[in-house]
């Protein structure tokens, strides 16, 4: 079952998500491609793919990219990404046969899943000897501007952030090996409009009453009178499939 906060929040904000969310740094993608052996002839599942922020980078590895996304508005944009096979579906019921993919990636999405059910499904579609990678772009609050952006987000968000509770799913299930973490620096250049899109892309902002949402967007626009940079830590978690 897809979390209704994700459906409501992302369904109405798919365009803002595509414009406002950062991509992933080249060194992170290169490490991921090597770690997951993403080469021509292999198939990678990008699960909860959104608008294809990671999917389009996976295409560059030469691997076949199958992307699954439950939110229709996000999937419409995903379908425009060259080289990606976009499917409707959820992590808890992946529309693929058993042992049909060589790797699975999940970017900015696993925290929305029912973790144990999703891990069982991912284990089912992965071939033996393969691996799962989870990615998040975390706002780096050591940077003053990024901290100011985060303060506005925290003050206005309509529901609490879904934090590191996602890892409990790995503790409760025995489908994958202990998680390996690599962290990479990431930067995003924004102006007044794209920093507003960045805020609007948060599901907890998208569901606010209209006037509150407008006020939050005014506040972040004021942070970017000219082109500015938000800083992130891109976290890549990798776990191998157990037999």
Tell what function each PLM region has.
Residues 1-40:
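Conserved class I S-adenosyl-L-methionine
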Residues 33, 56-59, 119, 123:
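A structural alpha-helix within SAM-dependent methyltransferase catalytic domains
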Residues 41-42, 99:
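Nucleotide donor/acceptor-binding cores
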Residues 43-45, 51-93:
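Class I SAM-dependent methyltransferase SAM/SAH-binding core
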Residues 92-103:
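A short acidic, Gly/Pro-enriched loop at the edge of an enzyme's catalytic core
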Residues 102-116:
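A short SAM/SAH-binding and catalytic strip from SAM-dependent methyltransferases
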Residues 117-188:
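Conserved catalytic/acceptor-binding region of the Class I
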Residues 166-243:
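Conserved Class I S-adenosyl-L-methionine
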């Amino acid at each position: 079952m897809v979390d209704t906060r994700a459906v409501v929040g992302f369904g109405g904000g798919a365009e803002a998500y595509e414009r406002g969310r950062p991509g992933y740094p080249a060194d992170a993608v290169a490490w991921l491609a090597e770690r997951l052996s993403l080469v021509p002839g292999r198939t990678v599942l990008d699960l909860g793919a959104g608008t294809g922020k990671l999917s389009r980078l996976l295409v560059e590895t030469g691997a076949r990219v199958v992307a699954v996304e439950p939110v229709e508005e996000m999937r419409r944009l995903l379908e425009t990404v060259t080289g990606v096979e976009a499917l409707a579906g959820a992590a808890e019921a992946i529309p693929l046969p058993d042992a049909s993919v060589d790797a699975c990636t999940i970017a900015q999405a696993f925290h929305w899943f029912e973790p144990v059910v999703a891990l069982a499904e991912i284990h089912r579609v992965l071939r033996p000897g393969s691996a799962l990678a989870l990615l998040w772009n975390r706002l780096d609050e050591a940077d003053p501007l990024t901290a100011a952006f985060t303060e506005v987000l925290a003050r206005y968000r309509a529901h609490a952030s879904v934090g590191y509770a996602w890892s409990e799913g790995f503790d409760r299930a025995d489908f994958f090996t202990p998680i390996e973490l690599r962290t990479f620096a990431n930067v995003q250049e924004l102006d007044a409009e794209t920093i507003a899109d960045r805020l609007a892309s948060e599901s907890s902002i998208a569901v606010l009453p209209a006037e509150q949402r407008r006020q939050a967007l005014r506040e972040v626009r004021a942070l970017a009178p000219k082109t500015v940079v938000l800083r992130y830590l891109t976290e890549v978690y990798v776990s191998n499939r157990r037999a």
